[in-house]
Each structure stands twice: as structure tokens, then as C-alpha cells.
């Protein structure tokens, strides 16, 4: 029976640096699953709608950048190997979302947010601190974060033009995946955050969405 490879602290730091580069450098990440948008027809949208959808997808892309950083930070400081492995697996699944959003943004003739490095650093730090506190808090933070993401995705789905089937297919699959991540984190023993904490997280999320919609 094969044994799981043990990484030294230096190995883990190098892996984190590699993950950060693949997350932040344009077109450097690769998805495991094809984009749900591939099978959808490409309908013409007005310039106003195109810019609006690009802004929404830019928000979602930055959200995935934050998710990558959060999971990687938690994986670095998680105490139990099974929790660390779960964080690393979740980060791999989020790569698909990252790539899909980036591809759609480029199809719409726009760009990803210049603020991504800032939000990556902040999210990585939050994830690392949560992991240091306890694995239960770390998992609970995942569940609470995914709840926020699901809320944003639902709002964005309502705002999409009816003819934009490509963006809709991407966001619907992302919503399904994120709901599963939240449920899995709680089932693994995650702490259910109280309403005031979730409210504070929501305020921070609004800062991200407002700032990345245009830049």
C-alpha cells in the first residue's frame, strides 16, 4: 500500500508560491473540466449588457482568486492531514471556476481585476490564521465563505441578460459546486459561524464586489 508523501515546510512554501503564480498570472491555470459555456450558443448582446456581464464575471473571477488563496492558506496551517488534504482538493476544484471565468471575461473583450494580487494576499492570510486557530474554525470559515459566494452567484444569475447562455451555464455549475463545498465543510466538523460574523464577512465581500466590478 502506497504511503502519502510527506512535505517539509520548505516544500509546502514552494507549492504555495507555485499555486499563487498559477492563480494570478493570466492564462497560466488549466481546468480539469471543460467550461459549461462550450455547448451554449454565442448570442450577440448590446454593448451595455456586454460590459455589465464582464463586470459580473470579473467579480466572480476575483472571488475564485480569493477562494484559492483561502484554501491554500488553510492547507498550510491545518493541523490534521485529512483537513489539509480536503483543503487542497477543494482548491483544485476551484481552479475550474477560475479558468472558466477568465475565459468568459476574455470572450467578452474585457480583463481580470488588477486588484487580484491584493485580494489573494488578504485571503491567504485569513485562511492561514483560521487554520492556526483550529481545524473546526477553518472548515467553518470555508462554509461561511461559500455561503457568501452562493449568494453572489444567485444575484448575478438574476442580472444576466436572457440571451447570455454561456455565462449562465458557468455560474449555474459554479453555484452547484460551491453549495457542495459548503455542505462538505460542515459535515467534516466545521463550526457554524454566528450571524454577526457572517454579517461582517458580507461587508468585506461588498468591498470586493464594488471595487472589482470595473477594475
UniProtKB/Swiss-Prot annotation:
Membrane topology: Peripheral membrane protein
GO CC aspect terms: plasma membrane
Major subcellular site: membrane
Composition-biased stretches (Low complexity): 26-37
Gene3D superfamilies: 1.20.1260.10
CDD domains recorded: DMQH
Pathway(s) where this gene product acts: Cofactor biosynthesis; ubiquinone biosynthesis
Reaction(s) catalysed (UniProt annotation): a 5-methoxy-2-methyl-3-(all-trans-polyprenyl)benzene-1,4-diol + AH2 + O2 = a 3-demethylubiquinol + A + H2O
Residues noted as binding Fe cation 1 in the record, renumbered to the chain: 64, 94, 97, 178
Compartments, record wording: Cell membrane
Positions of region (Disordered): 25-44
Residues involved in Fe cation 2 binding: 94, 146, 178, 181
EC code(s) of this entry: 1.14.99.60
UniProt entry keywords in alphabetical sequence: Cell membrane, Iron, Membrane, Metal-binding, Monooxygenase, Oxidoreductase, Ubiquinone biosynthesis
Family note: Belongs to the COQ7 family.
Function: Catalyzes the hydroxylation of 2-nonaprenyl-3-methyl-6-methoxy-1,4-benzoquinol during ubiquinone biosynthesis.
HAMAP family on file: COQ7 (MF_01658)
Protein name: 3-demethoxyubiquinol 3-hydroxylase
Protein's organism: Pseudomonas syringae pv. tomato (strain ATCC BAA-871 / DC3000)
Lineage, top ranks: Bacteria, Pseudomonadati, Pseudomonadota, Gammaproteobacteria, Pseudomonadales
Gene this protein is translated from: coq7
